[in-house]
Design a protein with these regions (language model features):
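C-terminal catalytic/motor cores of large multi-domain enzyme assemblies
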Residues: 1-203
Length: 203
């Protein structure tokens, strides 16, 4: 039986996240780790988006394992897993990510280091793309595509015109498991975390 995936997009203001990254990158913190941590913390509040399904059953993992897409030099793709990313501190997460990427590119990862993700993150922001949709990997219920953060002219709630840095994120989800309201609520809460309280990610 074929299933239908669907897409939901959201625009997130990243000024506070970018400021936090500039503050912490000298300590080895990566933007990928920051994004993975933000996603994982939000997933812990939205277990439906961390779930997966088949034609006969749904699976609700006890852990939040964020798989992050990494391009290989031979043109392939692998998804190293940041296990329990909602519980691991940001600095350990950054060190773990650096180690996973290094071993992924030398093809030294163990199967459970790339096959146990419960949610996938694909970040093409470093390539400057405005937006993209990611293909849902087997075994997970959703994947989040993250585009570049750019200066954008916006209107404030008070009607003033200002410039803020914003990025577009797009969620691809399995409709057998996740409904549109689940996806929208997850993206809303992710945006609120990144926009209003990114410093909590470093605690």
């Amino acid at each position: 039986m074929l299933f239908r995936s669907f897409h939901v997009g959201y625009t997130i203001t990243t000024d506070k996240l970018d400021a936090l990254y500039k503050q912490l990158k000298g300590k080895g913190v990566t933007m990928t780790a920051l994004l993975a941590k933000a996603v994982a913390v939000t997933l812990a509040r939205h277990p439906q988006v961390n779930a997966s399904g088949s034609d006969t059953a749904m699976t609700y993992p006890e852990r939040v394992n964020v798989a992050v897409a990494v391009a290989m030099e031979d043109g392939g793709l692998i998804t190293p897993v940041l296990a329990e990313a909602d519980r691991v501190d940001l600095y350990t997460l950054s060190r773990t990510w650096a180690d996973l990427v290094s071993r992924a590119r030398s093809k030294q990862l163990k199967p459970d280091e790339y096959s146990t993700g419960t949610f996938t993150l694909s970040n093409l922001g470093m390539f400057g793309v405005d937006r993209f949709d990611a293909i849902l990997p087997p075994g997970t219920g959703a994947i989040l595509a993250v585009a570049a953060s750019r200066p954008t002219v916006v209107a404030t709630k008070e009607g003033a015109i200002t410039v803020r840095r914003q990025m577009q994120v797009n969620l691809t989800a399995d409709h057998r498991v996740i409904y549109g309201t689940h996806a929208a609520a997850f993206l809303r809460d992710l945006a609120q975390l990144i926009e209003n309280d990114p410093d909590s990610l470093a605690l």
